[in-house]
């Protein structure tokens, strides 16, 4: 007897990158540059550590479930994002949030279009509830976007949901709020899921559109620019009706008190995050400038996120450089989710000093 969910039986799993750093003794991790998961390359705000230590040293509460409605956290998100608390809800990461969205808005055989190649975990989440996922890809040569062709596909297929990672991981494409608004008005019967995991690096958000349109949900995270990946905090911005729908199945007690309080501390020190973003932009500009010396070997695609996609003349050259970087304790992300990125890898951008080290190791590879 096969008890496995019929949608899981032939489901292609999300391919995780190696997380070798956790196999390294903690005292030896300092020299590792982990540039494969688009995490921040610095620690969170010192106020986060101070708050966590305060909790650990204070009266015990770990035997209790966390609060199921943290008004202080909702207020902190509202203050940072500039939207009413009624249009906000927090979750245990945006990955978990995507699962709730799929369970709340998708039924068997519903059509979903992913603008890709993109973050592949969302594809898996949709398919696990029986939705039919197809892709509209950026141009395979240069990852430019054909808006007319995209909209023609939406008009033809009439999807229930469209997923747009903005800026897109791994290609770095960015769509303006004005264009997103155009999509919302042109396709009112389609729910657009805007994944703004990297928005702090990119510029204007589409967040304000949730106050006017009910066919958009924006998801955000503290894992990237706020350097809070280990705390697993994400949040959504949506109409009150859409939040209420997700709330029917949301488990409000699966976010630890430590994570909730750390998130409040991080949001209250948003200037720390903004300073880090500026350092990343500086490091990114330096890296792109230096890679121009290898223009005959490497194509560096422009990006509005804290990462860049690099394409090589051959898969063999790409693989050899990945190994060389790893041998020097620098880990990057091999991209395999689509043929258009098979000769590529993605590099998380860090500070200028960190990117100088990456450039130095790449230089040593090409001087061999």
Model-derived features: where do they sit?
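Short acidic/glycine-enriched loop/turn segments that link adjacent beta-strands
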Residues: 70-71, 230, 304, 339-343
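PLP-dependent aminotransferase class I/II
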Residues: 43-45, 215-293, 299-301
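N-terminal small-domain helix-loop-helix segment of the aminotransferase-like
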Residues: 2, 9-93, 100
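Short loop segments at secondary-structure junctions
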Residues: 238-242, 268-269, 312-315, 352-353, ...
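Conserved core of the PLP fold type I
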Residues: 49, 60-187, 198-213, 217
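PLP-dependent enzyme catalytic core of the Aspartate aminotransferase-like
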Residues: 327-328, 337-368
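Conserved PLP-binding catalytic core of the aspartate aminotransferase-like
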Residues: 281, 294-328, 345, 349
